[in-house]
């Protein structure tokens, strides 16, 4: 065991003391504690008794004695993990892991530690990768060397290397008898599968560990791209995301984004669940574990819990039969109005309204139209002007303190390929644009996206730009919000290009 190399690796991963050492008493964690001591670092030892085995008090006593011998403060706690798992109806191993890491983080906060060290080895890495592949978790990135403040400095070392290090020092360790139980998947791989693999492929574990390292590097890049594609639709009171940025993403990026969605729901990112979300994106509703309904309505993907909880502010009630709105264009049934606004049928009976009898005077967040809809209406009027002038019908308004600027595309009229509505507004506003909010009928292209970001302008758009959108087409991260008056914005564009095609045929 190369202690100087370990010291250097530890300094890179966790440069500041004190460190929290997760020590169970097994060979790997005992070796970790001894190596940290040899490296000259300051640490505390944390030991959690899961209350799962009658021998656990002996493990605790062993670790306490080790900590005292090394001069490290000792922290311990006992938790009845089985009882918690049974009460929740959850997997025992998953609950044990959750409870264990919660304990370690509490200790870290108490002592002011910036790193928690665990004793995962190269063997653990290989087992995890193979287990992930066999269980269909669709990632197979294995165990990361660093996650938040959790650091795993022994991933390059095998279990046998650490045992040899302990034997050379005459050190003892505890053996957990449950590690010999083949009913547990990880134990089955360790006891039966890997011995067979290594007979034929002696370097199997190192190969799997290298695979995990490469996958983790690739995943980091793709993960950032996937996260950018998850554009929340904040108009609704349930998890909802714009569909087009997901649908237009490359397959590998889209599936990673969908796995992130599953994780946000507290579900395992299994391949079969990713495929269900793909189906939902394409308009075929799917039910996920826990009764969550994934369905697309219009340009939004909804993740509807089995019992959605919508707020009910004072003075509001739930919709009732016969409810209607009195609008300048005439009377409209409430159910039709909600459908027009993209509200899925599961939420219609729950949407908060304020009414006088059956005449609805307010629909929470939707009527009277919020300011963003009024500004988008102005942008639509500008887009209509562009339509009449033979320009691609994109309009925009820039809302600044004390004034509102308006523009529409004038590429043809000015013979200027940069004369997009957004660019014209930025030129007019100059330095005053910073901190403003732009409402535009079509998602900005790359040019406008970069200019708006540089100018510090917030963006709200109507329809996604499938051909040139900075996010939808090219996957650039954005803090924009989309979907405001989407139908009207998209219809204007469809009508324009239909007229253009008709003119081409007539010509």
Swiss-Prot record:
Q: Which residues bind Zn(2+)?
A: 420, 445, 448
This entry's Enzyme Commission designation comes to 6.3.4.19
Subcellular localization: Cytoplasm
Q: What GO terms in the biological process aspect are recorded for it?
A: tRNA modification
Catalytic reaction list: cytidine(34) in tRNA(Ile2) + L-lysine + ATP = lysidine(34) in tRNA(Ile2) + AMP + diphosphate + H(+)
Domain CMP/dCMP-type deaminase: where?
Answer: 370-500
Q: Which family does it belong to?
A: Belongs to the tRNA(Ile)-lysidine synthase family.
PANTHER family, alphabetically?
TRNA(ILE)-LYSIDINE SYNTHASE-RELATED
Q: Which NCBIfam families does the annotation name?
A: lysidine_TilS_N (TIGR02432)
Q: What is this protein called?
A: tRNA(Ile)-lysidine synthase
Which source organism? Thermus thermophilus (strain ATCC 27634 / DSM 579 / HB8)
Read off the lineage from the record: Bacteria, Thermotogati, Deinococcota, Deinococci, Thermales
Instruction: State the encoding gene.
Output: tilS
